[in-house]
């Protein structure tokens, strides 16, 4: 029983990111001019596509955008499965992001900060 616990704790200490981040794109609303004035369509969103690169399920990934804002993706992310999510954002000037904290289902945490 000690070996699985010890191994899972070491996953949280690894310096390599435990996810493979394939896409991290910020989308902004578009404003169009029409006869009635400007119309805004859409909203600020973060499109992330990633997969768990470990053998342990992940329960939460914190993404930090290049303007310092953060957004979490919470769920059960199984090893090797591609996750493709669009997450809502507040107004932002960000153009990119990185995964900075990953929480595993067993409670271990990887911190890339």
Question: Each PLM stretch: what is its role?
Answer:
Residues 1-12:
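Hydrophobic alpha-helical targeting segments used for export or membrane insertion
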Residues 17, 70, 74, 78-79, ...:
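Terminal connector regions
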Residues 17-62:
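Short, surface-exposed binding/anchoring microloops in extracellular/periplasmic proteins
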């Amino acid at each position: 029983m000690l070996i699985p616990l010890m191994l899972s704790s070491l996953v949280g200490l690894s310096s390599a990111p435990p996810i493979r981040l394939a896409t991290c794109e910020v989308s902004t609303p578009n404003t169009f001019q029409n006869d009635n004035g400007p119309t805004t369509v859409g909203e600020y969103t973060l499109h992330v596509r990633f997969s768990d690169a470990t053998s342990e399920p992940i329960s939460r990934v914190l993404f930090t955008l290049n303007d310092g804002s953060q957004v979490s993706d919470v769920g059960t992310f199984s090893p090797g499965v591609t996750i493709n999510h669009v997450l809502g954002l507040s107004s932002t000037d960000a153009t990119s992001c990185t995964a900075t904290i990953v929480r595993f289902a067993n409670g271990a945490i990887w911190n890339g900060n």
